[in-house]
Regions:
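Short solvent-exposed loop/turn micro-motifs enriched in small/polar/acidic residues
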Residues: 14-16, 75, 91, 103
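Hydrophobic residues in beta-strands and at strand termini
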Residues: 34-36, 84, 125
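Polybasic, low-complexity association/targeting segments
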Residues: 1-15
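Hydrophobic beta-strand-centered segment that forms part of the acyl-chain substrate-binding groove
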Residues: 60-97
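Catalytic strand-loop segment that frames the active site of acyl-thioester-processing enzymes
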Residues: 11-51
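Residues that act as N-cap/strand-start positions at coil-to-secondary-structure junctions
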Residues: 17, 90-94, 117
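HotDog/MaoC-like acyl-thioester-processing domains
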Residues: 18-19, 25-30, 99-146
Length: 146
């Protein structure tokens, strides 16, 4: 399943995503088993001596995986109750759980393979307003060939 998640920039966009090891879905809830590669570009410059997964990547991934597997075309309009609880480095395995509550709140929880919570929060969703803008293009402003 890894590598199947490509955004507007094809394979380059998928390089910014973790590998998907498994997916479970029940109702309006999804659980993704994920692993981030040792050479993933998301660690570039964050930080040279101690690579740490940026929090913004965790937010982005929750939105991308929810949208890809649910078919929901809405985009993120805001974030609430965001809490980062653990540093994540290259090669680590973790689970992302997403649950759609109410009509526009996506609750997410990242849990490390050792059971420790990594981060939690809520993404507020709204209808897509601009044609041609894809929420799975990472990093923002990145174009193919860069």
């Amino acid at each position: 399943m890894a590598g199947n998640l490509t955004g507007a920039n094809g394979a380059e966009a998928s390089a910014w995503l973790p590998d998907v090891l498994g997916v479970e879905q029940a109702g309006h809830s999804w659980r993704f088993a994920l692993q981030i590669g040792f050479a993933a570009p998301v660690f570039s410059g964050h930080f040279p001596d101690l690579p740490i997964l940026p929090g913004v990547a965790q937010l982005h991934w929750a939105g991308v995986f929810y949208q890809r597997y649910s078919g929901d075309a809405r985009v993120i309009r805001g974030v609430r109750r965001l809490k980062f609880q653990r540093i994540v480095g290259p090669g680590e395995r973790f689970e992302l759980s997403c649950e759609l509550r109410r009509s526009n709140e996506l609750h997410f929880v990242y849990v490390h393979s050792d059971g420790e919570r990594m981060s939690t929060g809520q993404l507020l969703l709204q209808p897509r307003m601009v044609e041609g803008v894809t929420p799975d293009a990472w990093p923002p402003g990145h174009t193919a060939g860069e």
